From Swiss-Prot:
The lineage of its organism: Eukaryota, Viridiplantae, Streptophyta, Embryophyta, Tracheophyta. GO terms for molecular function: metal ion binding; pectate lyase activity. This is Pectate lyase. The active site is at residue 312. It comes from Lilium longiflorum. Binds 1 Ca(2+) ion. Required for its activity. Keywords: Calcium, Glycoprotein, Lyase, Metal-binding, Signal. It comes from the Eukaryota. Its cofactor is Ca(2+). Pfam families: Pec_lyase_N, Pectate_lyase_4. Belongs to the polysaccharide lyase 1 family. Its EC number is 4.2.2.2. Residues 1-22 form the signal peptide. Gene3D superfamilies: Single-stranded right-handed beta-helix, Pectin lyase-like. Pathway: Glycan metabolism; pectin degradation; 2-dehydro-3-deoxy-D-gluconate from pectin: step 2/5.
Length: 434
């Protein structure tokens, strides 16, 4: 009996170790230290009162539709005026000098990732070379050289380019990848990996047709290279990281997920993205046994879940997920799902059900009987349901948990098409409103 218990414990231990060192073949002293620092940063980034963050976000959305300035920003585009239809975009898009003040973007983030500053404390680094020839000694001018630096950098692109990554691109702390002003495509190669780091912004790029990388020796900082196992082929993989903002990114056709957020990642905002042509779209929490995902807090806002999508928009485990003012125009199986009692607050989204009669339900609970999942807090507030779509709620009244400081609701689902109309990477020109 004791031998059997020991064997089972050993299996669980090694499974947990393998999970916590995702894609790292040799979990050496460098990665062990980096993992501990990342965990400490994540705990610090976690907010014990997530309702206050949702209230702050809702107030910003509400304010963006008030006053004369709003009417100017929502006017028709017949004369070429700038249209900025949600509070994140209103913060920067209609300023002609955005390219001279790129770092002002950090003032615009909302939701759980609102404290993210990326590389704002560092220099601007210009990518001029789309090649990815060396994984251990990347050339100056390449994207890989920029993201592995140990200091903050605001990374921009000197021209439009297609970058085919030979292996996963491992992004270091305090980085912004800012594609505004160029057509930047990460395509046909390996994924972007944000692992055991903090303070990263990815903005204004296209990511598509991503394949698994075979692994091998890859540099992940100025001072360290390590052996990596096979990467999954996600578009963006966020592993054990905090203070992350993904904004105005277009994603399609990746081998695994478009965006995965796993292993205790938290303080994350995914906003203004356009997601298309994919099955498993967005995974928030990868394992039912990884209870550390309890600290996961993610805002999913102003995104367009578009043509060719099947499921997981997102699929959640544990944690707290605020799904607000997104446009769900396509799914085949379901839109929002989960297991292991995540809290999911759906506010002001538009859900357009497919013509498949069995797929009208927005929600899907996995691996739990109704007696169990009926206790999970899944709430729909102000959502718009089209073509027979419906959201199965559960849990007690979430309103009782709200902070009394701000009880302003998100804009209802009828506003969503306007709020998300400029999702995905934008065609920004320098010295012009974007």
């Amino acid at each position: 009996m004791k031998a059997a218990q020991f064997f089972l414990y050993s299996l669980l231990f090694f499974a947990s170790a393998a999970l916590s060192s995702a894609n790292i073949a040799e979990f050496d002293e460098y990665w062990q230290k980096k993992s501990k620092v990342a965990q400490a940063k994540a705990k610090k980034a976690y907010t014990p009162h997530p309702e206050e963050v949702t209230n702050h976000f809702n107030k910003a959305v509400h304010s963006s539709f008030e006053g004369n300035s709003t009417r100017r920003n929502l006017r028709t585009n017949k004369l070429g005026q700038c249209l900025a239809t949600n509070p994140i975009d209103r913060c920067w898009r209609c300023k002609k000098n955005w390219s001279a003040n790129r770092k002002d973007l950090v003032k615009c983030v909302k939701g759980f990732g609102r404290k993210t500053t990326g590389g704002a404390a560092g220099e601007i680094y210009v990518v001029t070379d789309p090649s990815d020839d060396s994984l251990t000694d990347p050339k100056f001018g390449t994207l890989r050289w920029g993201v592995i630096q140990d200091r903050p950098l605001w990374i921009i692109f000197g021209k439009s380019m297609v970058i085919r990554l030979k292996q996963e691109l491992i992004i270091n702390n305090d980085k912004t990848i800012d594609g505004r002003g160029a057509n930047v495509q990460i395509a046909g190669g390996a994924q972007l990996t944000v692992q055991f780091v903090h303070n990263v912004i990815i903005h204004g790029i296209h990511i598509h047709d991503i394949k698994p990388g075979e692994g091998g020796l890859i540099r992940d900082s100025e001072k360290h290279s390590g052996i990596r196992t096979r990467s999954d082929g996600d578009g963006i993989s966020i592993i054990g990281s905090s203070n992350i903002w993904i904004d105005h990114v277009s994603l399609a056709r990746c081998s695994d997920g478009l965006i995965d957020v796993i292993l205790g990642s938290t303080a994350i905002t995914i906003s203004n993205c356009h997601l298309t042509e994919h099955d498993d779209v967005m995974l928030l929490g990868a394992s039912d046994t990884y209870t550390q995902d309890e600290i996961m807090q993610v805002t999913v806002a102003f995104n367009h879940f578009g043509r060719g999508l099947v499921q997981r928009m997102p699929r959640c485990r544990y944690g707290f997920v605020h799904v607000v003012n997104n446009d769900y125009t396509h799914w085949i199986m379901y839109a929002v799902g989960g297991s292991q009692h995540p809290t999911i607050i759906s506010q002001g989204n538009r859900y357009i059900a497919p013509h498949i009669e069995a797929a009208k339900e927005v929600t899907k609970r996995d691996y739990a009987e109704p007696a169990e999942w009926s206790k999970w807090t899944w709430k729909s507030q102000g959502d718009l349901f089209v073509s027979g779509a419906f959201f199965v709620e559960s849990g007690g009244p979430f309103e009782n948990k709200y902070s009394k400081k701000d009880l302003i609701k998100a804009k209802p689902g009828t506003f969503v098409q306007r709020l998300t109309r400029f999702s995905g990477a934008l065609n920004c020109k320098e010295n012009m409103e974007c």
